[in-house]
Amino acid sequence: MAEEQQNSSYSIGGNILPTPEEAATFQPQVVAEGGWDKCWEDGVTPWDQGRATPLILHLLDSSALPLGRTLVPGCGGGHDVVAMASPERFVVGLDISDKALNKANETYGSSPKAEYFSFVKEDVFTWRPNELFDLIFDYVFFCAIEPEMRPAWGKSMHELLKPDGELITLMYPMTDHEGGAPYKVALSSYEDVLVPVGFKAVSVEENPDSIPTRKGKEKLARWKKIN
């Protein structure tokens, strides 16, 4: 395993996770050449830890995640979807990439939890399901979209949540690098697009479970839909 330094790549189970600054130097070219499918086809997935996000596991262990219908936009390989799924929490993993969803289904299609989650190919900006969600979890989706699309993201989060629903954002990467994806974010990046549509931040804190290359570069924010 790579030495745990904040400014160098880090390996988890064979997955090399670069810093966001490093990822922003090569990932955009692959996306430009063939979209997100090309990233998955070529194995250029620096956002994918190959396992559930440690923070999600921590929240589950401490019973700090709401129950009910849950959405993970940009679910990728589906690790967080399956981790959160339970008889009391049905989870929908959404992605526009066939390759990502194929991988998710190959990995988790025979999971004993299979009846408690589903993977759906849809665009979160246009998809309107028959039933709204109690919880949405966004980690590396917000930072992957073009910054000018962020107001539309905020509107979609509002439209997809039930009244009094909760949005959990693991805000990353909180850096000052140029370019993307991943694009740099700040708390204000979220406030600017969530507060005007009816969200209130109920807590903002450092992520105690960051992997080494992301330590000090991400924060956990929990938002309530108040109107």
Swiss-Prot record:
GO cellular component term, pick one: cytosol
Gene: HOL2
Record's keyword annotation contains Methyltransferase: yes
Catalytic activity reported: a thiol + S-adenosyl-L-methionine = a methyl thioether + S-adenosyl-L-homocysteine + H(+)
EC category: transferase
Protein name: Probable thiol methyltransferase 1
Species, as recorded: Arabidopsis thaliana (Mouse-ear cress)
Source taxon at top rank: Eukaryota
Family according to the record: Belongs to the class I-like SAM-binding methyltransferase superfamily. TPMT family.
Residues that bind S-adenosyl-L-methionine: W36, W40, W47, G74, D95, D123, V124, Y139
